[in-house]
Design a protein with these regions (language model features):
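C-terminal motif of bacterial Sec signal peptides marking the signal peptidase cleavage site
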Residues: 5-8
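Ser/Thr-rich, Pro/Gly/Ala-heavy low-complexity intrinsically disordered linkers and tails
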Residues: 13-64
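Boundary/entry segment of secreted carbohydrate-active catalytic domains
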Residues: 60-113, 119, 381
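Substrate-binding cleft of secreted/luminal carbohydrate-active enzymes
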Residues: 77-88, 141, 281-285, 315-416
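Structural preference for beta-strand elements that scaffold enzyme active sites
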Residues: 81-83, 102-106, 139-143, 186-190, ...
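Aromatic- and acid-rich polysaccharide-binding/catalytic face
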Residues: 102-107, 263-312, 383-384
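Substrate-binding cleft of extracellular glycoside hydrolase catalytic domains
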Residues: 114-237, 241-244
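Aromatic-lined carbohydrate-recognition surfaces of secreted/lumenal glycan-active proteins
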Residues: 190-192, 219-262, 279, 332-347
């Protein structure tokens, strides 16, 4: 069951096999929206107790500030370099067979109610326990992408004020945090990709405080407003209280304005109080959108799609870095960045490709130029498929295994 559901993020495409919407000019939205006890410290709103903070801090009485990236990576128990991760479409057995050892492994949690992620193992919620333990046994940090809001259809804002749906929704969020707390170790949590873009697109004046939502029914959130803004704040507040070792990140969707405007929208939902920023790279191999008759998951956008490695023409890598940097500055609190759902195709001068073998150059560029990302406050890059027809480590001809090995042999990109 969940081998299919792992492709949960939809970017507006509807259904379990879509991909996450990314940056304006780079990925857009396929629906057409715009083109406890602590380990190293407790982060809350960019402040810390103990040994560090997601937004910078100090350790051991040393008054020197610790970069936010270093502080977060230290809490994860990983080396002080830009970390590499793998997500959906890249099974552990393939990592093992190719001797790939990622720092992070990402897994989707999808659905609400019958057939949702809590039911995938027994007892309810054990999917988190078993998945995390397998990932940890392989030496990686578990990351979970919470993708429950798309259950009733992406962009369906009526769900957030529906008592039956939200009762199930919050029960599963609580169960998620309880299972994470029981692990006793840090995990990363990516909170509801795409949803915040739909909130901004549909809210009057793009203000999440003007969409009604059921929030204050949760004891940890009784003082929060019953709005979509309060919903985001509750995800953070509940996590802090139930699973203080969980590190939380919000993914902005760049459909609704400039980086500064989107930062204001995301501050309203509490994104500045999280531990990191989830930068949605782009959700499809470029070649999948270039073919004359693309699969459904690659339709609905206009090109060009293949990014310019010389960074002279649009779209290109420096543009996307600048956009996220501007967002980070406007959001405040100096949060570190995790690039997510980064496509895994292989470079080619010939546009297009075939299913599972479409061209793309993100792996090649980002692993060869990882220091650019380290210099812009990145602490991790997670590579994964955004749909069932995209390239993975199973079909990339060994590209990721080779380039990640070379990256690690060079010592990795330093953190800023």
């Amino acid at each position: 069951m969940f081998s299919v559901l792992l492709f949960g993020c939809g970017g507006g495409g509807g259904g379990s096999q879509g991909g996450s919407a990314g940056l304006i000019g780079f990925a857009g939205n396929s629906s057409g929206q715009g083109g406890s006890g602590q380990s190293g410290g407790t982060a809350s709103g960019g402040t810390a107790t103990g040994g560090g903070t997601a937004g910078g801090g100090t350790t051991g009485g040393d008054p020197s500030p610790i970069p936010s990236t270093t502080a977060l990576v230290t809490r994860l128990g990983k080396p002080a370099r830009v970390l590499l991760g793998l997500g959906a479409g890249n099974p552990l057995d393939q990592m093992k067979s190719q001797d790939i050892h990622p720092d992070i492994v990402d897994t989707y949690l999808v659905g609400v109610g019958a057939g949702a992620w809590p039911t995938w193992n027994s007892p309810d919620g054990a999917y988190i326990t078993y998945t995390a333990q397998a990932i940890q046994a392989y030496g990686a940090v578990p990351m979970f992408t919470l993708y429950q809001m798309a259950t009733t259809g992406e962009g369906n804002m009526s769900a957030v004020n529906d008592t039956a749906f939200m009762t199930g929704y919050w029960a599963q969020v609580r169960l998620m945090y309880q299972r994470m707390a029981a692990l006793g170790t840090p995990v990363l949590v990516n909170l509801e990709p795409d949803f915040w873009g739909f909130v901004a697109a549909q809210a009057p004046n793009r203000d999440a405080a003007q969409i009604a939502a059921i929030v204050s029914s949760q004891p940890e959130c009784s003082a929060l407003p019953n709005t979509a803004a309060g919903l985001g704040q509750c995800l953070v507040q509940m996590g802090r209280q139930i699973a203080p070792k969980a590190l939380l990140g919000f993914p902005p969707a760049f459909w609704s304005g400039t980086p500064a405007e989107i930062a204001a929208q995301m501050r309203a939902v509490g994104a500045h109080q999280a531990d990191f920023i989830v930068a949605q790279t782009t959700d499809r191999d470029a070649g999948c959108r270039e073919v004359p008759s693309p699969p459904a998951e690659c339709t609905g956008r206009t090109g060009p799609f293949y990014w310019d490695e010389s960074n002279q023409t649009s779209p290109n890598f420096h543009e996307s870095q600048s956009q996220i940097s501007a967002y980070r500055a406007a959001l405040g609190n100096g949060l570190p960045i995790l690039w997510w759902q980064t496509p895994m195709g292989v470079p080619s001068t010939t546009p297009g490709g075939t299913d599972l073998h479409y061209r793309d150059n993100h792996v090649d560029y980002m692993l060869r130029n990882a220091q650019e990302y380290g210099d812009t406050h990145t602490f991790a890059i997670v590579f994964s498929t955004g749909g069932q027809f995209q390239t993975s480590i199973t079909t990339d001809g060994g590209q990721f295994a080779r380039l990640s090995s070379q990256y690690l042999a060079r010592g990795g990109a330093t953190l800023k």
